[in-house]
C-alpha cells in the first residue's frame, strides 16, 4: 500500500499508518511531485490547502480513498472522486470540544468584560468600577442547533448553572430532556434567552437568520455568540442593535467575509472578535489527524467505511438504476421539511411498484438527507443519514408494496412526515425520462416538477387566485417557469369552496417580502418558498 499524507498532520497520526509493506510519504517528500506520486497511490490524506479537484484526480490511477483531516470537503471534487470509485471520508466532531470551549470562553469574556479589562491593564489603567460584570449562573442560554457542538456547549453551560433552551427541529423532546434541555420554537427561544449561541449549518433558511427582525424578538440586553458560520448573522443589523443597546454584547469567531476588513463590528467596543480559531487547539488538530489516519487504515485493511460522504453500498449498475429515485426522494424530503412546521418526530416511507423490490436503503437515506439538511449543522449524506436520524431520536419507518397500484407510473414513492404540530404526505415518481415529479400533496393530486426554486400555495378554490398570484410575481420581476394546480374532490351537496394547491416553479429565489404579499390574498391560507438544491 502507498499512502500520501499531502499536508502536515501530527507524528502520532502518521504512525497510525505504519504497517509492514506499506509506504507512507509525507508532505515534505511529495512537495512539487504530488501528481507523480498519485499515479501509484492507494490513499491520499489532505487538510484544506491541497485541492483534490478533477484535474488532480486524473492522475489517480489506483486511488481508493481520500481522507480529509477535518470536516469541510470543499477542496475535494466529490463528483470526480465518486466517478473514479474513490471513497471520501472526513472527521466530523473531532473538534467539537474545542469549539464548545471557545463558545463558553466568549460568553465569559462578555459577561466579565475580560477583553476590555485586559486592554485597560496593559494601558496602565486600574478601572474596577466600569468593569463590573454579571454571572452566567441562573441565566438562560438559548442554543440554536443541537448537533455535536451544541450538545457539548449544553453540557458545559449546565455546569455553570445555566438554564437551557434549544431550537432544533431534528432533535426529539426525549433526547433533549435527557440532557436537561427544553425545546422551543425560535420566537420562544429569542424571547427567553439571556445568551444565544449559534450551532447550525449554512442553508437558505439559516442564512442571515440573525437580523433586524429576529433581534427585535429578543430580550433587551441579550448577548450573542457565533462560532458556527459567519453568514448566519447580518453584521450590519447586529452592529446597529449593539449601538442602540438592544444587544448588550456579541462575540464572533466567524464572519461573512474573512478576514472581515469592512465589517461594522470592528469599530465597536462591546464586541469580542477572534479570527476563526474555534477549532484551533493542539488537541483538536491531533484528534482530526489520528482519527482520519485510523479511518483510512481500516478502509485499506478491512474495507470498513467510516464517515464517508460519497459511498453507496450497491454495485455501479444498481446505483445507475436507482439514482433518479434517490434524487426524487431527496427533493421530496426537502419539500416536506420546508412546508412543515414544528419539531419532526417521524418519517415514514412507502415504496410502491417495481421500486419496492429493490434495495431501498439509499433511497430511504436520500429522503432523510433531504429532510435533515434543511437545518443540520452536520450535513447528512447517503451513507450517514439514517444514523443521524437515529441519534436524534427520529423514528423512520418503511413499507414495500410491489403490487400496489401506481397509476401507470411504474414506481411511486410516498413520504409521510409527522411533526409535533402537524402531519404531511407527498407522493412522487420519476417520469418523462429521469425527471422527478411531485404527484400528490396532502390528499390533493397535482403533477409538478421538483425543480430548484418553488412556491407552495394552499388556498380556497375561488376565482381570481391564479391571476393575483401571477400579478404579484410579475410586479416583483419573478419569472414563472411552470404553474401546477390541484384541488380536492368536491364534497357531495356542499356549497363551500374546495381546497386547492399550487406548486409554482420560478426562475430564482423568492424573498420573504414576496411571500408576505402572497399571504395578503384573501383566499391564500399558506405560502411557502421551497429551495430544493
Q: What is the predicted role of each segment?
A:
Residues 1-89, 211, 491:
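An N-terminal-biased, well-structured beta-alpha scaffold segment characteristic
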Residues 27-28, 47, 69-70, 85-97, ...:
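Short beta->alpha connector loops at strand-helix junctions that form conserved
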Residues 50-57, 169-264:
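Rossmann-like adenosine-cofactor binding region
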Residues 84, 92-140, 148, 152-159, ...:
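Phosphate-binding beta-alpha-beta segment of Rossmann-like dinucleotide-binding domains, i.e.
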Residues 84, 88-89, 169, 221-339, ...:
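Rossmann-like dinucleotide-binding domain for NAD(H)/NADP(H)
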Residues 100-119, 139, 158-162, 290-304, ...:
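Oxidoreductase and adenylate-handling cofactor-binding alpha/beta cores
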Residues 313-356, 360-533:
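A conserved regulatory-domain signal marking ACT and ACT-like small-molecule sensing domains
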